[in-house]
C-alpha cells in the first residue's frame, strides 16, 4: 500500500530560491510540492486551492511579511508552517505567531550547506506534518519559594526540540530570583540560541543568557546551551558550572539533551529536577532516566499539550518520567517540587 505524500506549499519571493527549494525537497518520495507562491496573497489562494499539509514560508516578503501573514492565517486556517529565515530575531516572532519550526537559510554557493539544509528541511517538513496545532493555554505562575541558600545546591535541567521555544518561555517567564539555577538545551542552530536567550532575558524576571564555558550556575539565572556546542554540568569547589565545547552530534543534535541530562545525573545526583518537553525523536530520554536513577525528580510534558509528542513519549515509556503534566501545569508542579527539596 502506497503511503500518502505530504502536500507542501513553498512561499518565497525569490524565483530562484523557490525552484531550488522545490527540487531539493522533492527528492524525498514522501514529499510532494503541490504549488509555489511569491507572496502572502498568492499563498492564500494556493492554500484554498490545494489544501497543503505543510507550508514553508520566508520571513521577509513584499506586500506582507511572513510574520504578518502567519498572524492573519492561523486563526482562520491553522496550518503547520516551517519558516525559512536568515539569522534574525524575527524568527521568534514567527514561532510566537504559530509556526512549528524554522530552518536557517543556506549559502546558495556552497553545495555542502545546501545538502545539510535540505536534509534538515525535509526532516522538519515531516515533523510538521504530524505536529499538533492548537491554542496555547495560559500558564499558572511559579510563586516565590521563600527559600534562599538551600536552593543553591539544586539544579533544574530542561530539554526540548520542536515546539520548545514557546514551551520553555511559558515556563521560564514565571521563574523568580529564588528559582534554582536552570540549564536548558533547546535544539537550535548556532547564532539563534544567543538571540533566543536575549529575547527571554528581555521578557523574564530572571537573567537568561547563552551559556559560555565555565559559567557558574546561579539561583535566579537560566543558561541556554549554545548552538553547535555540547553543554555539560560540572561541580567545582562546591559550585555548579557548565562546560561548553564543540562536539559531535548525539542523537543527531548538538547541543543534545542527553549530554546535558547525563552530566546532571553525574554531578547533581538527587539534587536536581529534570523536565523533558515537546519534540520529535528520543533525545533526552536516556539522560532523564539516568537522572531519575540518580534520585532526581523528573517531569514530562503530556501528549495533549505537546506540539510533537516524541521525546516525552519515549522518556515516559522508558520509565524516565516520574509524572506527566500539561504545559500549563508544569510551572505549578515544579513549584511544589522545589518546596519539597
Swiss-Prot record:
* Enzyme Commission code: 3.1.1.61, 3.5.1.44
- Top EC class of this enzyme: hydrolase
Which keywords has UniProt assigned to this entry?
A: Chemotaxis, Cytoplasm, Hydrolase, Phosphoprotein
| GO molecular function ontology, one term from the record | protein-glutamate methylesterase activity
Keyword Acetylation part of the UniProt annotation: no
**Active site positions, chain numbering:** 161, 187, 283
- Supply the InterPro entries for this chain: CheB-like, CheB_C, CheY-like_superfamily, Sig_transdc_resp-reg_Me-estase, Sig_transdc_resp-reg_receiver
- Per the UniProt record, one Pfam family is Response_reg
* Annotated positions of the 4-aspartylphosphate modification: 58
Which GO annotations describe the biological process of this protein?
chemotaxis
Give its localization. Cytoplasm
Q: What does this protein do?
A: Involved in chemotaxis. Part of a chemotaxis signal transduction system that modulates chemotaxis in response to various stimuli. Catalyzes the demethylation of specific methylglutamate residues introduced into the chemoreceptors (methyl-accepting chemotaxis proteins or MCP) by CheR. Also mediates the irreversible deamidation of specific glutamine residues to glutamic acid.
Full protein name? Protein-glutamate methylesterase/protein-glutamine glutaminase 2
